[in-house]
């Protein structure tokens, strides 16, 4: 027993302090716990937690010799230079002063636990053994900002001059608006030179309001809110700034600026009127001198979305879509025009228009105007013209014109079933385009009228040797010179129907003419006059593929087309002939006319002549060829005309001209044949290319111009 006491004395000492490591939690026990503690001992355990925390201590086991007033053995708890209690006994015993479940709390970060034992533990002569105690401690946050009237530990009470903010393990200080925290982190000094307010509403006041404001201030309170908002200011009572009865604001003054303008300088005891600044940026400058005891000012600022003026149309044709009772920042409106009118921004035509309300309360673009759509001058019509149905010269929306062709030489091409009343009528639409109800934007076409001479030949008797033609008798007649004089007939307004052998003649020992000089004359019955009119350049020469130049006696496929470089202008002496469409044009005895500048009496006439001939019997023509011992093929692509008894026929120079027959049912003239070949001049029958058999080929080559 004595050895045990010696060891304890050596470890703890009779009197001494035990410093526990600084931790956030831990446990404290009596010496040798849970074995009985030694006698005659006094130790102090120092519990320390980090700064900014307090110490909380709770006993879980407590078995210390009980005594009246805990005079023998005891545990004493101290903190903040105060004794929190002196305890002995057992936790559940009424003897002594046990701590029970009480929590002990320090105000600072340190707590002292002193354990004292006397020289013995006897009770009525019997030695008693006590286990001592087991306690747990932990660090809890210290609210440095809380009022601590009982704290006596120096430096514990925070010294924030204005505002104190607690956090776990510490605190920090801040200042009222208009003051600046000093380097000591606790004291505040007036500083209001750059106060900024960005909330959409709030309060702004002078320092210490409603207490007297400090002297020598140079304050700048800036309100900056989102673009598109406007700030409203409402001053509250009391309003009190030093002033003078005779001089305006000589001492202290409040100045208000917005949009670069001074909205006023205020002082005295009359609060300013409510102000709508029409700006999202407002500055309040507050200056004070070195003296005075006025209470200052306070205002409540609010914001609302800035408004733009109501849009107004500049003319009666402008339509503002879905107008609103008011327009605010970022709102927009769209504008259209009444049908037939065009949006115009200056001189620029617009497809659409939208204006947006800007942050400064203005529209981002000016209101446009609506100008009536103008379709412009109608296109000129080839071989036709137009007239105004509505006011002459007016080409704007709903104006109407009517195209017409130069009749009787041209007629307007229309689709099947189209209305006669709407033919050629075009109206200026709301889109600014001339349109026909049936044809749309497509321009009308004036097509040549075929087979309608204004002065048709009326001779009914046969004429021996032919006779001169009068102007307009055969307006389709063409005079060609390639290797010699020849004839042809006008188809449409740019094609010449002729015989292939006039271009590639069947001369022995002559190669194909690959680049003939082809001259075409049109529009007169007099040779001198027709040449004065000038020749028409040829763009293309098209020979039928069945034609064989190298076979001198074979006139199969003796047909050709000349495409002129330019269309000719039709008139009374220049009209096309029609193409046949049935076999009735080839009946025996049917009379036809052949015209040309062919040889008469071994000379070329100076005037167009014609002859009236009947379609001959095919078998008679074939027998006549046999009598002449002519072996030239007389195919189904040919026919013959004439009468050997009267010695009428086409002659040299007439080749390529056409055999013209009048269709009495339709009152048109048709080219049923082309002067092709024969034996001599006026000695019997003449042979012609049968045009009906080549109509499909002709139409194919002419395309949409046939």
Curated annotation (Swiss-Prot):
Annotated protein name in UniProt: Complement C1r-B subcomponent
InterPro entries recorded: CUB_dom, EGF-like_Ca-bd_dom, EGF-like_dom, EGF_Ca-bd_CS, Pept_S1A_C1r/C1S/mannan-bd, Peptidase_S1_PA, Peptidase_S1_PA_chymotrypsin, Peptidase_S1A
Record-listed (3R)-3-hydroxyasparagine modification sites: 166
Location of this chain's protein in the cell: Secreted; Cell surface
Lineage: Eukaryota, Metazoa, Chordata, Craniata, Vertebrata
Primary site of residence: secreted
Domain Sushi per the UniProt entry, residue ranges: 306-372, 373-448
Residues the entry annotates as binding Ca(2+) 3: 242, 252, 289, 293
Binding positions (Ca(2+) 1): 65, 73, 118
Subunit structure: Core component of the complement C1 complex, a calcium-dependent complex composed of 1 molecule of the C1Q subcomplex, 2 molecules of C1R and 2 molecules of C1S. The C1Q subcomplex is composed 18 subunits: 3 chains of C1QA, C1QB, and C1QC trimerize to form 6 collagen-like triple helices connected to six globular ligand-recognition modules. Within the C1 complex, C1R is a dimer of identical chains, each of which is activated by cleavage into two chains, heavy and light, connected by disulfide bonds.
Source species: Mus musculus
PTM entry text: Cleaved and activated by autocatalytic processing to generate Complement C1r subcomponent heavy and light chains that are connected by disulfide bonds. The iron and 2-oxoglutarate dependent 3-hydroxylation of aspartate and asparagine is (R) stereospecific within EGF domains.
SUPFAM superfamilies: Complement control module/SCR domain, EGF/Laminin, Spermadhesin, CUB domain, Trypsin-like serine proteases
Domain remarks: The CUB domain 2 shows a compact folded structure in the presence of Ca(2+), whereas it has a flexible, disordered conformation in the absence of Ca(2+). Ca(2+) could provide a switch between the folded and disordered forms; low Ca(2+) could provide flexibility to promote autoprocessing and activation of CIR.
Ranges for domain CUB: 17-140, 192-304
Keyword Membrane found: no
